[in-house]
Curated annotation (Swiss-Prot):
Keywords: Ribonucleoprotein, Ribosomal protein, RNA-binding, rRNA-binding. PANTHER family: 60S RIBOSOMAL PROTEIN L26 FAMILY MEMBER (PTHR11143). One of its GO terms (biological process) is translation. Belongs to the universal ribosomal protein uL24 family. Part of the 50S ribosomal subunit. The keyword rRNA-binding applies. GO terms for cellular component: large ribosomal subunit. This is Large ribosomal subunit protein uL24. It comes from the Archaea. It comes from Pyrococcus abyssi (strain GE5 / Orsay). Gene3D superfamilies: 2.30.30.30. The lineage of its organism: Archaea, Methanobacteriati, Methanobacteriota, Thermococci, Thermococcales. Transmembrane segments: none annotated.
Amino acid sequence: MRLNSKQPRKQRKFLYNAPLHLRQKMMAAPLSKELREKYKIRNLPVRVGDKVRIMRGDFKGHEGKVVEVDLKRYRIYVEGATLRKTNGTEVFYPIHPSNVMIIELNLDDERRKKIIERRAG
C-alpha cells in the first residue's frame, strides 16, 4: 500500500482504483481506550459484527453493530443509524469508518485473532 506521490489527483486515483484487499485495510477505525489497552493496537479494519460508537455526524453518540461494510463506497452501515425514505422504508445511513470508534470486536474469525496477536507483538 505504498504510494509515493503527494499530488492530490494521484491520491484520489489510488483511492478510486484500489484493489479490494487494500480497500479493506483503508476501512480501519480507532479502538476504544479499553480495547487499546487490552490489545496494544490503535486501530483495526472494521468488520461486520463489530460494535461501534459513531463519533461524528448526525448520528453522533449512537452505538450499534456493523451490519454491512461497503468496500466499493468506503462506507459502513450501523444498526440504529437509519433514515426514513418518503415511501416509509428504512434505509441505513452510510458512515465513513474514520468517524466511528470500535468498542467491541467480533472475534468469531480465527484469522482475525491471529492478526491481532501478530500486530500486538
